């Protein structure tokens, strides 16, 4: 069954990750992309899970992705000296 799209609702893909350098490193939203439909947002989120290049680590040695909800994923990225992760989520702007 196809969902009826609310013409006012904007669907978003949000990426949360470690941002900044040194003492100013923090967990934050680094990117928000907006879409007209949930299906478009889900497709973009799934692509980000596979292809997004996080700020840390600089030299990623791979990635393991875990779907933790219907619309959210955690991606584990080992680097040369530390391991990082980022989260990709689909939401709607309210």
Residue ranges and their predicted role:
Residues 2-30:
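Short aromatic-glycine-(Arg/Gly/Cys) micro-motifs in beta-strand/loop hairpins
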Residues 16, 32, 78-81:
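Intrinsically disordered, low-complexity regulatory segments enriched
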Residues 26-40:
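A short, exposed loop/beta-hairpin motif centered on an aromatic-Gly-Thr core
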Residues 36-43, 92-94:
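Short, surface-exposed linear segments at secondary-structure transitions and domain or protein termini
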Residues 42, 46, 57:
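Acidic, metal/cofactor-coordinating or nucleic-acid-engaging core segments within structured domains
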Residues 50-94:
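Short, mixed-charge low-complexity intrinsically disordered segments
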């Amino acid at each position: 069954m196809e969902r009826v799209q609310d013409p006012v609702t904007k669907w978003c893909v949000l990426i949360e990750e470690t941002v900044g350098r040194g003492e100013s490193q923090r967990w934050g939203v680094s990117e928000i992309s907006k879409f007209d439909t949930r299906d478009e947002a889900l497709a973009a989120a799934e692509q980000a899970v596979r292809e997004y290049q996080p700020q840390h680590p600089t030299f990623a040695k791979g990635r393991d992705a875990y779907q933790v909800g219907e619309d959210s994923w955690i991606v584990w990225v080992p680097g040369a000296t530390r391991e990082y992760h980022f989260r990709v989520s689909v939401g709607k702007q309210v």
